[in-house]
Protein backbone atom coordinates (compact mmCIF):
# COMPACT_ATOMS: atom_id res chain seq x y z
CA UNK A 1 0.00 0.00 0.00
CA UNK A 2 1.59 3.26 -1.09
CA UNK A 3 1.83 6.35 1.08
CA UNK A 4 -0.95 8.89 0.76
CA UNK A 5 -0.48 11.69 -1.80
CA UNK A 6 0.12 15.18 -0.49
CA UNK A 7 -3.04 16.44 -2.21
CA UNK A 8 -6.20 14.40 -1.57
CA UNK A 9 -8.04 13.29 -4.73
CA UNK A 10 -11.12 15.27 -5.68
CA UNK A 11 -14.39 13.45 -5.18
CA UNK A 12 -15.86 15.13 -8.25
CA UNK A 13 -13.98 13.03 -10.75
CA UNK A 14 -12.42 9.60 -10.75
CA UNK A 15 -9.11 9.26 -12.52
CA UNK A 16 -8.60 5.62 -13.33
CA UNK A 17 -5.84 6.51 -15.75
CA UNK A 18 -3.38 8.62 -13.76
CA UNK A 19 -0.78 5.88 -14.11
CA UNK A 20 -0.56 6.35 -17.87
CA UNK A 21 2.02 9.11 -17.59
CA UNK A 22 4.37 6.92 -15.56
CA UNK A 23 3.97 3.72 -17.55
CA UNK A 24 7.33 2.38 -18.68
CA UNK A 25 8.46 -0.57 -20.71
CA UNK A 26 8.79 -3.57 -18.43
CA UNK A 27 9.54 -7.22 -18.61
CA UNK A 28 6.40 -9.34 -18.48
CA UNK A 29 5.91 -10.97 -15.13
CA UNK A 30 3.43 -13.58 -14.03
CA UNK A 31 3.05 -12.11 -10.56
CA UNK A 32 3.41 -8.74 -8.92
CA UNK A 33 2.70 -7.31 -5.52
CA UNK A 34 1.60 -3.70 -5.46
CA UNK A 35 0.82 -3.25 -1.79
CA UNK A 36 3.90 -4.08 0.28
CA UNK A 37 5.51 -1.32 2.32
CA UNK A 38 9.04 -2.25 3.29
CA UNK A 39 9.23 -3.01 7.00
CA UNK A 40 13.00 -3.51 7.27
CA UNK A 41 12.61 -6.38 9.75
CA UNK A 42 10.51 -9.53 10.18
CA UNK A 43 6.87 -8.94 11.10
CA UNK A 44 5.63 -10.47 14.33
CA UNK A 45 1.95 -10.82 15.20
CA UNK A 46 0.85 -11.94 18.64
CA UNK A 47 -1.31 -15.06 18.18
CA UNK A 48 -4.84 -14.59 19.46
CA UNK A 49 -7.23 -17.33 20.58
CA UNK A 50 -9.88 -18.57 18.16
CA UNK A 51 -13.21 -16.79 18.36
CA UNK A 52 -15.05 -20.04 18.98
CA UNK A 53 -12.81 -20.78 21.99
CA UNK A 54 -13.75 -17.69 24.00
CA UNK A 55 -17.04 -16.89 25.76
CA UNK A 56 -19.68 -15.16 23.63
CA UNK A 57 -19.36 -12.01 25.72
CA UNK A 58 -15.65 -11.69 24.79
CA UNK A 59 -16.08 -12.35 21.08
CA UNK A 60 -16.88 -8.75 19.97
CA UNK A 61 -13.64 -7.40 21.49
CA UNK A 62 -11.59 -10.28 20.08
CA UNK A 63 -13.22 -9.74 16.68
CA UNK A 64 -12.01 -6.12 16.70
CA UNK A 65 -8.47 -7.18 17.68
CA UNK A 66 -8.33 -9.67 14.82
CA UNK A 67 -9.54 -7.01 12.38
CA UNK A 68 -6.74 -4.72 13.58
CA UNK A 69 -4.15 -7.49 13.20
CA UNK A 70 -5.26 -8.10 9.61
CA UNK A 71 -4.33 -4.51 8.72
CA UNK A 72 -0.68 -5.62 8.65
CA UNK A 73 0.58 -6.06 5.07
CA UNK A 74 3.17 -8.66 4.00
CA UNK A 75 5.65 -8.81 1.14
CA UNK A 76 4.54 -11.63 -1.16
CA UNK A 77 7.31 -10.94 -3.67
CA UNK A 78 9.73 -12.37 -1.12
CA UNK A 79 8.48 -15.94 -1.01
CA UNK A 80 10.65 -16.87 1.98
CA UNK A 81 9.91 -13.98 4.34
CA UNK A 82 7.43 -14.12 7.22
CA UNK A 83 6.02 -17.50 6.18
CA UNK A 84 4.61 -18.26 9.62
CA UNK A 85 2.96 -14.85 9.99
CA UNK A 86 1.56 -14.95 6.45
CA UNK A 87 -0.10 -18.26 7.23
CA UNK A 88 -1.36 -16.90 10.55
CA UNK A 89 -2.99 -13.91 8.81
CA UNK A 90 -4.50 -16.20 6.17
CA UNK A 91 -6.05 -18.45 8.81
CA UNK A 92 -7.28 -15.40 10.74
CA UNK A 93 -8.96 -14.00 7.62
CA UNK A 94 -10.59 -17.38 7.04
CA UNK A 95 -11.84 -17.34 10.61
CA UNK A 96 -13.26 -13.82 10.17
CA UNK A 97 -15.11 -14.90 7.01
CA UNK A 98 -16.72 -17.81 8.86
CA UNK A 99 -17.49 -15.70 11.92
CA UNK A 100 -19.29 -12.91 10.06
CA UNK A 101 -21.24 -15.49 8.04
CA UNK A 102 -22.64 -17.60 10.87
CA UNK A 103 -22.58 -15.38 13.97
CA UNK A 104 -25.50 -13.22 15.03
CA UNK A 105 -25.04 -9.86 16.69
CA UNK A 106 -21.40 -9.53 15.57
CA UNK A 107 -21.94 -6.29 13.63
CA UNK A 108 -22.03 -3.71 16.39
CA UNK A 109 -21.62 -0.02 15.60
CA UNK A 110 -17.98 -0.23 16.74
CA UNK A 111 -17.15 -2.87 14.12
CA UNK A 112 -18.04 -0.77 11.05
CA UNK A 113 -15.02 1.58 11.07
CA UNK A 114 -12.66 -1.31 11.88
CA UNK A 115 -14.02 -3.46 9.04
CA UNK A 116 -13.70 -0.62 6.51
CA UNK A 117 -10.21 0.22 7.83
CA UNK A 118 -9.03 -3.39 7.50
CA UNK A 119 -10.47 -3.71 3.98
CA UNK A 120 -8.99 -0.35 2.93
CA UNK A 121 -5.52 -1.22 4.25
CA UNK A 122 -5.47 -4.43 2.24
CA UNK A 123 -7.11 -3.59 -1.10
CA UNK A 124 -6.38 0.11 -1.69
CA UNK A 125 -2.94 0.46 -3.22
CA UNK A 126 -1.13 1.81 -6.26
CA UNK A 127 -1.46 -0.76 -9.02
CA UNK A 128 1.75 -1.88 -10.76
CA UNK A 129 2.50 0.13 -13.90
CA UNK A 130 1.44 -1.46 -17.16
CA UNK A 131 2.79 -0.53 -20.59
CA UNK A 132 -0.32 -0.58 -22.77
CA UNK A 133 1.82 -0.53 -25.92
CA UNK A 134 3.50 -3.83 -25.03
CA UNK A 135 0.68 -5.61 -23.23
CA UNK A 136 -2.02 -7.10 -25.44
CA UNK A 137 -4.93 -8.28 -23.24
CA UNK A 138 -6.17 -10.53 -26.06
CA UNK A 139 -2.84 -12.33 -26.42
CA UNK A 140 -0.75 -11.90 -23.25
CA UNK A 141 -1.28 -13.47 -19.85
CA UNK A 142 -2.40 -10.92 -17.23
CA UNK A 143 -0.19 -9.91 -14.33
CA UNK A 144 -1.54 -11.76 -11.30
CA UNK A 145 -1.48 -10.23 -7.84
CA UNK A 146 1.08 -12.08 -5.71
CA UNK A 147 -0.73 -11.22 -2.48
CA UNK A 148 -3.91 -12.93 -3.68
CA UNK A 149 -3.91 -15.56 -0.85
CA UNK A 150 -4.72 -12.69 1.53
CA UNK A 151 -6.47 -10.35 -0.87
CA UNK A 152 -9.06 -12.92 -1.92
CA UNK A 153 -10.09 -13.54 1.68
CA UNK A 154 -10.35 -9.80 2.37
CA UNK A 155 -12.71 -9.42 -0.60
CA UNK A 156 -14.67 -12.49 0.51
CA UNK A 157 -14.98 -11.05 4.02
CA UNK A 158 -16.12 -7.66 2.73
CA UNK A 159 -18.79 -9.22 0.51
CA UNK A 160 -20.12 -11.27 3.46
CA UNK A 161 -20.11 -8.04 5.49
CA UNK A 162 -22.18 -6.19 2.86
CA UNK A 163 -24.56 -9.13 2.42
CA UNK A 164 -25.10 -9.74 6.13
CA UNK A 165 -28.71 -9.51 7.34
CA UNK A 166 -27.42 -7.34 10.19
CA UNK A 167 -25.71 -4.85 7.87
CA UNK A 168 -27.02 -1.31 8.40
CA UNK A 169 -26.32 1.16 5.55
CA UNK A 170 -27.27 4.06 7.83
CA UNK A 171 -24.19 3.32 9.96
CA UNK A 172 -21.90 2.15 7.15
CA UNK A 173 -22.44 5.28 5.03
CA UNK A 174 -20.18 7.20 7.44
CA UNK A 175 -17.25 5.06 6.28
CA UNK A 176 -18.25 3.76 2.83
CA UNK A 177 -18.45 7.17 1.19
CA UNK A 178 -17.58 8.84 -2.13
CA UNK A 179 -13.85 8.69 -1.42
CA UNK A 180 -14.11 4.95 -0.74
CA UNK A 181 -16.00 4.43 -4.02
CA UNK A 182 -13.41 6.43 -5.99
CA UNK A 183 -10.60 4.22 -4.71
CA UNK A 184 -12.67 1.13 -5.42
CA UNK A 185 -13.26 2.19 -9.03
CA UNK A 186 -9.54 2.79 -9.58
CA UNK A 187 -8.92 -0.86 -8.66
CA UNK A 188 -10.97 -1.97 -11.67
CA UNK A 189 -7.82 -1.25 -13.70
CA UNK A 190 -6.15 -4.25 -12.04
CA UNK A 191 -4.76 -6.73 -14.56
CA UNK A 192 -5.79 -9.64 -12.34
CA UNK A 193 -9.20 -10.89 -13.59
CA UNK A 194 -9.85 -12.58 -10.24
CA UNK A 195 -9.69 -9.26 -8.45
CA UNK A 196 -11.90 -7.52 -11.01
CA UNK A 197 -14.50 -10.25 -10.56
CA UNK A 198 -14.62 -9.63 -6.80
CA UNK A 199 -14.68 -5.86 -7.33
CA UNK A 200 -17.68 -6.28 -9.61
CA UNK A 201 -19.61 -8.00 -6.83
CA UNK A 202 -18.51 -5.46 -4.21
CA UNK A 203 -19.51 -2.42 -6.30
CA UNK A 204 -22.82 -4.02 -7.21
CA UNK A 205 -23.60 -4.62 -3.53
CA UNK A 206 -22.65 -1.04 -2.62
CA UNK A 207 -24.84 0.32 -5.44
CA UNK A 208 -27.75 -1.73 -4.14
CA UNK A 209 -27.31 -0.84 -0.45
CA UNK A 210 -26.42 2.87 -0.62
CA UNK A 211 -29.10 4.86 -2.46
CA UNK A 212 -27.21 8.09 -1.84
CA UNK A 213 -24.16 6.84 -3.77
CA UNK A 214 -25.97 5.62 -6.89
CA UNK A 215 -25.84 8.82 -8.95
CA UNK A 216 -22.20 9.33 -7.92
CA UNK A 217 -21.23 5.79 -9.00
CA UNK A 218 -22.92 6.24 -12.39
CA UNK A 219 -21.17 9.58 -12.88
CA UNK A 220 -17.74 8.13 -12.11
CA UNK A 221 -18.27 5.16 -14.44
CA UNK A 222 -19.28 7.71 -17.08
CA UNK A 223 -15.99 9.58 -16.49
CA UNK A 224 -13.93 6.39 -16.74
CA UNK A 225 -15.53 5.47 -20.07
CA UNK A 226 -15.06 8.97 -21.52
CA UNK A 227 -11.36 8.94 -20.60
CA UNK A 228 -11.07 5.43 -22.03
CA UNK A 229 -12.69 6.34 -25.37
CA UNK A 230 -11.25 9.79 -26.02
CA UNK A 231 -7.86 9.78 -24.27
CA UNK A 232 -6.21 6.55 -23.19
CA UNK A 233 -7.92 3.47 -24.69
CA UNK A 234 -6.49 1.65 -21.67
CA UNK A 235 -8.59 0.39 -18.77
CA UNK A 236 -8.75 -3.25 -17.77
CA UNK A 237 -12.15 -3.27 -16.07
CA UNK A 238 -14.45 -2.05 -18.85
CA UNK A 239 -16.21 -5.42 -19.23
CA UNK A 240 -16.87 -5.68 -15.50
CA UNK A 241 -18.20 -2.11 -15.25
CA UNK A 242 -20.48 -2.73 -18.23
CA UNK A 243 -21.76 -5.89 -16.58
CA UNK A 244 -22.71 -3.87 -13.50
CA UNK A 245 -24.33 -1.26 -15.74
CA UNK A 246 -26.43 -3.94 -17.42
CA UNK A 247 -28.09 -4.65 -14.07
CA UNK A 248 -28.38 -0.94 -13.27
CA UNK A 249 -30.06 -0.16 -16.62
CA UNK A 250 -32.45 -3.05 -16.09
CA UNK A 251 -33.62 -1.34 -12.89
CA UNK A 252 -34.14 2.14 -14.37
CA UNK A 253 -37.63 3.54 -13.81
CA UNK A 254 -39.75 4.70 -16.74
CA UNK A 255 -39.81 7.14 -18.37
CA UNK A 256 -36.02 7.23 -18.68
CA UNK A 257 -34.29 10.37 -17.44
CA UNK A 258 -32.53 12.61 -19.95
CA UNK A 259 -29.17 11.84 -18.31
CA UNK A 260 -29.66 8.11 -18.95
CA UNK A 261 -30.48 8.68 -22.63
CA UNK A 262 -27.46 10.96 -22.96
CA UNK A 263 -25.25 8.27 -21.39
CA UNK A 264 -26.44 5.81 -24.05
CA UNK A 265 -25.80 8.13 -27.00
CA UNK A 266 -22.69 9.99 -25.77
CA UNK A 267 -20.86 7.20 -23.93
CA UNK A 268 -22.05 3.67 -24.76
CA UNK A 269 -22.31 4.15 -28.54
CA UNK A 270 -18.79 5.72 -28.85
CA UNK A 271 -17.38 2.73 -26.91
CA UNK A 272 -17.75 0.85 -30.20
CA UNK A 273 -14.84 2.82 -31.66
CA UNK A 274 -12.01 1.47 -29.48
CA UNK A 275 -9.56 -1.13 -30.77
CA UNK A 276 -10.09 -3.50 -27.84
CA UNK A 277 -13.86 -3.79 -28.46
CA UNK A 278 -13.76 -7.59 -28.53
CA UNK A 279 -12.83 -7.67 -24.82
CA UNK A 280 -16.14 -6.19 -23.70
CA UNK A 281 -18.46 -6.25 -26.72
CA UNK A 282 -20.86 -8.85 -25.30
CA UNK A 283 -21.45 -6.74 -22.18
CA UNK A 284 -21.77 -3.54 -24.24
CA UNK A 285 -24.32 -5.09 -26.59
CA UNK A 286 -26.33 -6.30 -23.60
CA UNK A 287 -26.46 -2.75 -22.18
CA UNK A 288 -27.61 -1.36 -25.53
CA UNK A 289 -30.39 -3.94 -25.83
CA UNK A 290 -31.48 -3.26 -22.23
CA UNK A 291 -31.91 0.42 -23.10
CA UNK A 292 -33.98 -0.39 -26.20
CA UNK A 293 -36.22 -2.77 -24.29
CA UNK A 294 -36.82 0.02 -21.78
CA UNK A 295 -37.49 2.69 -24.41
CA UNK A 296 -38.03 1.59 -28.05
CA UNK A 297 -37.90 5.22 -29.22
CA UNK A 298 -34.11 5.10 -28.70
CA UNK A 299 -33.76 2.58 -31.54
CA UNK A 300 -33.25 5.17 -34.28
CA UNK A 301 -30.40 7.12 -32.59
CA UNK A 302 -28.72 3.83 -31.63
CA UNK A 303 -28.86 2.39 -35.17
CA UNK A 304 -27.67 5.66 -36.70
CA UNK A 305 -24.87 5.79 -34.14
CA UNK A 306 -23.74 2.29 -35.12
CA UNK A 307 -23.87 3.28 -38.80
CA UNK A 308 -21.72 6.34 -38.01
CA UNK A 309 -19.04 4.25 -36.28
CA UNK A 310 -19.25 1.24 -38.59
CA UNK A 311 -15.76 -0.28 -39.05
CA UNK A 312 -14.12 0.58 -42.37
CA UNK A 313 -11.02 -1.62 -42.28
CA UNK A 314 -11.51 -4.25 -39.56
CA UNK A 315 -13.52 -7.28 -40.64
CA UNK A 316 -13.50 -8.78 -37.12
CA UNK A 317 -15.24 -5.67 -35.76
CA UNK A 318 -17.73 -5.74 -38.64
CA UNK A 319 -18.75 -9.26 -37.64
CA UNK A 320 -19.24 -8.04 -34.05
CA UNK A 321 -21.34 -5.08 -35.23
CA UNK A 322 -23.50 -7.41 -37.31
CA UNK A 323 -24.02 -9.69 -34.32
CA UNK A 324 -25.05 -6.76 -32.13
CA UNK A 325 -27.33 -5.43 -34.84
CA UNK A 326 -29.15 -8.76 -34.96
CA UNK A 327 -29.65 -8.61 -31.17
CA UNK A 328 -31.17 -5.15 -31.62
CA UNK A 329 -33.42 -6.31 -34.46
CA UNK A 330 -34.63 -9.16 -32.26
CA UNK A 331 -36.25 -6.63 -29.90
CA UNK A 332 -37.10 -3.83 -32.35
CA UNK A 333 -40.67 -2.59 -32.65
CA UNK A 334 -42.07 -2.73 -36.23
CA UNK A 335 -42.87 1.00 -36.00
CA UNK A 336 -39.21 1.72 -35.21
CA UNK A 337 -37.94 -0.64 -37.90
CA UNK A 338 -39.65 1.42 -40.60
CA UNK A 339 -37.67 4.50 -39.54
CA UNK A 340 -34.24 2.93 -39.97
CA UNK A 341 -34.74 0.25 -42.63
CA UNK A 342 -33.19 2.22 -45.51
CA UNK A 343 -29.81 3.15 -43.95
CA UNK A 344 -29.74 -0.21 -42.19
CA UNK A 345 -30.15 -2.34 -45.31
CA UNK A 346 -27.83 -0.14 -47.36
CA UNK A 347 -25.17 -1.08 -44.81
CA UNK A 348 -26.21 -4.75 -44.85
CA UNK A 349 -25.97 -4.71 -48.66
CA UNK A 350 -22.37 -3.47 -48.34
CA UNK A 351 -21.62 -6.25 -45.85
CA UNK A 352 -23.16 -8.90 -48.09
CA UNK A 353 -20.88 -7.63 -50.89
CA UNK A 354 -17.77 -7.81 -48.68
CA UNK A 355 -14.89 -9.88 -50.12
CA UNK A 356 -14.29 -11.11 -46.56
CA UNK A 357 -16.47 -14.20 -46.43
CA UNK A 358 -17.10 -14.04 -42.64
CA UNK A 359 -18.61 -10.56 -42.96
CA UNK A 360 -20.78 -11.60 -45.92
CA UNK A 361 -21.79 -14.83 -44.19
CA UNK A 362 -22.77 -13.06 -40.94
CA UNK A 363 -24.94 -10.56 -42.83
CA UNK A 364 -26.65 -13.31 -44.85
CA UNK A 365 -27.48 -15.21 -41.65
CA UNK A 366 -30.06 -12.48 -40.91
CA UNK A 367 -32.35 -14.32 -43.33
CA UNK A 368 -32.30 -17.33 -40.98
CA UNK A 369 -33.91 -15.23 -38.22
CA UNK A 370 -37.69 -15.66 -38.27
CA UNK A 371 -38.51 -12.29 -36.67
CA UNK A 372 -36.16 -10.38 -38.97
CA UNK A 373 -37.63 -12.26 -41.94
CA UNK A 374 -41.13 -11.16 -40.90
CA UNK A 375 -39.96 -7.53 -40.76
CA UNK A 376 -38.31 -7.85 -44.18
CA UNK A 377 -41.44 -9.43 -45.65
CA UNK A 378 -43.66 -6.62 -44.35
CA UNK A 379 -41.33 -4.06 -45.94
CA UNK A 380 -40.08 -5.99 -48.98
CA UNK A 381 -41.12 -3.18 -51.34
CA UNK A 382 -38.44 -0.99 -49.69
CA UNK A 383 -35.79 -3.57 -48.80
CA UNK A 384 -35.78 -5.69 -51.96
CA UNK A 385 -34.72 -2.82 -54.29
CA UNK A 386 -31.89 -1.92 -51.88
CA UNK A 387 -30.56 -5.48 -51.66
CA UNK A 388 -31.29 -6.88 -55.11
CA UNK A 389 -28.39 -5.63 -57.22
CA UNK A 390 -25.79 -6.66 -54.62
CA UNK A 391 -27.33 -10.12 -54.22
CA UNK A 392 -27.69 -10.74 -57.95
CA UNK A 393 -24.12 -9.65 -58.68
CA UNK A 394 -22.71 -11.82 -55.87
CA UNK A 395 -24.64 -14.85 -57.13
CA UNK A 396 -22.64 -14.56 -60.36
CA UNK A 397 -19.27 -13.26 -59.19
CA UNK A 398 -18.40 -14.10 -55.53
CA UNK A 399 -15.29 -16.24 -55.05
CA UNK A 400 -16.70 -18.30 -52.15
CA UNK A 401 -19.22 -21.03 -53.13
CA UNK A 402 -20.71 -21.10 -49.61
CA UNK A 403 -21.59 -17.40 -49.90
CA UNK A 404 -23.09 -17.97 -53.35
CA UNK A 405 -25.28 -20.75 -51.92
CA UNK A 406 -26.50 -18.47 -49.11
CA UNK A 407 -27.24 -15.70 -51.60
CA UNK A 408 -29.32 -18.08 -53.73
CA UNK A 409 -31.40 -18.90 -50.64
CA UNK A 410 -31.95 -15.19 -49.94
CA UNK A 411 -32.92 -14.50 -53.55
CA UNK A 412 -35.33 -17.43 -53.42
CA UNK A 413 -36.88 -16.03 -50.24
CA UNK A 414 -37.30 -12.61 -51.86
CA UNK A 415 -38.86 -14.20 -54.94
CA UNK A 416 -41.42 -15.98 -52.75
CA UNK A 417 -42.17 -12.79 -50.80
CA UNK A 418 -42.79 -10.51 -53.78
CA UNK A 419 -42.51 -12.30 -57.11
CA UNK A 420 -43.83 -9.36 -59.16
CA UNK A 421 -41.23 -6.91 -57.87
CA UNK A 422 -38.55 -9.60 -58.07
CA UNK A 423 -39.26 -10.13 -61.78
CA UNK A 424 -39.28 -6.37 -62.41
CA UNK A 425 -35.96 -5.92 -60.62
CA UNK A 426 -34.44 -8.87 -62.48
CA UNK A 427 -35.48 -7.40 -65.83
CA UNK A 428 -34.26 -3.94 -64.83
CA UNK A 429 -30.95 -5.33 -63.58
CA UNK A 430 -30.33 -7.28 -66.80
CA UNK A 431 -31.30 -4.25 -68.89
CA UNK A 432 -28.95 -2.04 -66.88
CA UNK A 433 -26.15 -4.59 -67.24
CA UNK A 434 -26.66 -4.72 -71.01
CA UNK A 435 -26.55 -0.92 -71.17
CA UNK A 436 -23.39 -0.93 -69.08
CA UNK A 437 -21.79 -3.52 -71.35
CA UNK A 438 -22.80 -1.51 -74.41
CA UNK A 439 -21.34 1.67 -72.90
CA UNK A 440 -18.20 -0.20 -71.94
CA UNK A 441 -17.84 -1.52 -75.49
CA UNK A 442 -18.41 1.97 -76.93
CA UNK A 443 -15.84 3.35 -74.52
CA UNK A 444 -13.29 0.73 -75.59
CA UNK A 445 -13.97 1.47 -79.27
CA UNK A 446 -13.59 5.20 -78.67
CA UNK A 447 -10.26 4.69 -76.92
CA UNK A 448 -9.10 2.46 -79.78
CA UNK A 449 -10.03 5.16 -82.33
CA UNK A 450 -8.22 7.80 -80.28
CA UNK A 451 -5.14 5.59 -80.02
CA UNK A 452 -5.20 4.96 -83.79
CA UNK A 453 -5.62 8.68 -84.46
CA UNK A 454 -2.72 9.56 -82.17
CA UNK A 455 -0.58 6.90 -83.82
CA UNK A 456 -1.31 8.31 -87.31
CA UNK A 457 -0.50 11.84 -86.18
CA UNK A 458 2.81 10.64 -84.83
CA UNK A 459 3.67 8.86 -88.05
CA UNK A 460 2.79 11.94 -90.14
CA UNK A 461 4.85 14.14 -87.84
CA UNK A 462 7.81 11.86 -88.32
CA UNK A 463 7.29 11.80 -92.11
CA UNK A 464 6.75 8.05 -92.20
CA UNK A 465 3.43 8.42 -94.03
CA UNK A 466 2.49 11.30 -96.40
CA UNK A 467 0.19 14.04 -95.06
UniProtKB/Swiss-Prot annotation:
The modification Phosphothreonine is found at residue 7. The B regulatory subunit might modulate substrate selectivity and catalytic activity, and might also direct the localization of the catalytic enzyme to a particular subcellular compartment. Interacts with cyclin G in vitro. InterPro entries: ARM-like (IPR011989), ARM-type_fold (IPR016024), PP2A_B56 (IPR002554). GO terms for molecular function: protein phosphatase regulator activity. This is Serine/threonine-protein phosphatase 2A 56 kDa regulatory subunit epsilon isoform. Residues 1-39 are annotated as: Disordered. Keywords: Acetylation, Cytoplasm, Phosphoprotein. PP2A consists of a common heterodimeric core enzyme, composed of a 36 kDa catalytic subunit (subunit C) and a 65 kDa constant regulatory subunit (PR65 or subunit A), that associates with a variety of regulatory subunits. Proteins that associate with the core dimer include three families of regulatory subunits B (the R2/B/PR55/B55, R3/B''/PR72/PR130/PR59 and R5/B'/B56 families), the 48 kDa variable regulatory subunit, viral proteins, and cell signaling molecules. Interacts with SGO1. Found in a complex with at least ARL2, PPP2CB; PPP2R1A, PPP2R2A, PPP2R5E and TBCD. The keyword Phosphoprotein applies. It is found in: Cytoplasm. The gene is Ppp2r5e. Residues 20-29 have a biased composition (Basic residues). GO terms for cellular component: cytoplasm; cytosol; protein phosphatase type 2A complex. It comes from Mus musculus. GO terms for biological process: signal transduction. Residues 30-39 have a biased composition (Low complexity). Belongs to the phosphatase 2A regulatory subunit B56 family. The modification Phosphoserine is found at residues 30, 32, 34. Its main location: cytoplasm. The modification N-acetylserine is found at residue 2. The keyword Protease does not apply.
Amino acid sequence: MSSAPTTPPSVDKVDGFSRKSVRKARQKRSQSSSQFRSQGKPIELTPLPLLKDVPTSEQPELFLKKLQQCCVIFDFMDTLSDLKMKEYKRSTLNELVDYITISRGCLTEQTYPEVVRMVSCNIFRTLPPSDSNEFDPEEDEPTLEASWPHLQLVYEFFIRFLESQEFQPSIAKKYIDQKFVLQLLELFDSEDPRERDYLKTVLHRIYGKFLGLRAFIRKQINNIFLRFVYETEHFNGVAELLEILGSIINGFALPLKAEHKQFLVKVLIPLHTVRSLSLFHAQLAYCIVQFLEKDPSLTEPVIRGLMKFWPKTCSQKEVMFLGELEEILDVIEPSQFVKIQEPLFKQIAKCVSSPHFQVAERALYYWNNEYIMSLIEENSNVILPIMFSSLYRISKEHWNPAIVALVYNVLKAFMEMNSTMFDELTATYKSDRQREKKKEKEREELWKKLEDLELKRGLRRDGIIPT
